[in-house]
Amino acid sequence: MFKNHPKGLIGAALSNIGERLGFYVMMAILVLFLEAKFGFGGTTKGVLIYTVFFTSIYVLALVGGIIADRTRKYKGTIGIGLVLMMIGYVIIAWPTPTPAPNKTLSLVFTCFGLFAIAFGNGLFKGNLQAVVGQLYDNPTYSGRRDVGFQIFYMFINVGAMFSPILAVGVRNWYVQSQGFGFNQTLPDLCNQYLSGTMTPEAMERFTGLAAEVSRGPVADLGAFAQKYLSVFVTGYHYAFIVAAVAMLISIFIFMANRKRLPDPAKKVVNKDAVAAAGAEMTLAEIKQRIYALFAVFGVVIFFWFSFHQNGVTLTYFAKDYTNLEGFVINLGFMKLEGAEMFQAFNPMLVVLLTPIVIGFFGWLKAKGKEPSTPKKIVIGMGIATAAFIVMALGSQGLPTKEALTQMGGLEQARLVTPWLLIGTYFILTVAELFISPLGLSFVSKVAPPKYQGLMQGAWLSATAIGNSLLILGAVFYNNIPIWATWMVFAVACALSMGTMLAMLKWLERVSK
């Protein structure tokens, strides 16, 4: 796979595996952790924190890009970012009491850890992508840039593939070790009971579920609610320890492979290298390239707003409306089950489908019919539109979230098949492979050399703006029919596709 690619590619890819594993352990459970620990269920507070955090990761990537571009110390910036992230994971892994005696202080402590992770990620993510792009500035490898970024992207998802399984496994193991059964809806019901907001219908369901997970009648529901919440949330805290360990491994891999990665700081003073790279771009050419990049950045905002619903509304849908009864892996000492498990499908499918997509584009290239990078992105937008239309069709007839809360949850017979989400994740993953790695390649190819880190940061900032809109997904989910929520995302992706299609010839000309 790495044949005919620069040696540094494998080091960069392996460095990213541990970091992504830790990151996606956290992202798989973050919203549900916030809801369970702080009682945010049925509100947008948890999603607001998730949105601000997810947005700041990509905004701070712009800051990280500026720092690396000015200092020319890309590898040093990346290393500091890795250490900061590990510190952040240690902070949120600390098992503070639940229910919290001082909820505000506990929330501030959690948010401080999230900020450390976000800032560290900002120093790491865009700059590592810039370094990978620099590997392909060598004319020997420049023709394989798209494939190189697809391989790099696949390795990102090798780490992410196991993250939800590890997160769910650690949490469920701890719940079982404390003598309880697992139930995804109980944390919300426990918080409703403790806050005195439970409806009579929900109370009946809560009493039944409490007896089910306790393996017998529960005499004191208040004591049960406090104990179950404490155990469930502590399981989440222990899952964050996995993220911290993964970061430690990533630091070790990066340091071991550091010498294989390019060092732009040295190239600045190497006049022969500068001469070999060709004459400086004219100001007009630089402007044209930057205009093209920002046009693409503006378009992909709406794709990321839709695609990153996997951690918000798609996870809510798995918890609230999906039949998880047969979606269980019993390992004896623990059961792998829960809404978070669906998030394993996207990275797993990326790993499985990337060689197929690379082979498909290679076959088209051999025939002289390979579409340009901008055209591939347009196709990806169309595929993403189809994914959300599938979700809308599969959600017909489901009650609103408000009605669901009053009922205390859906009866088993009314829950939808898990294949609806699995199929949607499959289609979205195909769309992602046409957009995300090729978008990175496009930025690397078009960005003026002196602004590589900045432009990679700007690409991630476009993602940040899309992420800042994630809370709208939760607002739609809580207030309009479920099928209509998915159609909002379908329309957003369709508009992105149409806009990109209108600019296609210009983008193809600039990227040549």
Per-region residue spans from a language model:
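Central cavity-lining transmembrane alpha-helices of secondary-active solute carriers
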Residues: 48-70, 161-163, 344-357
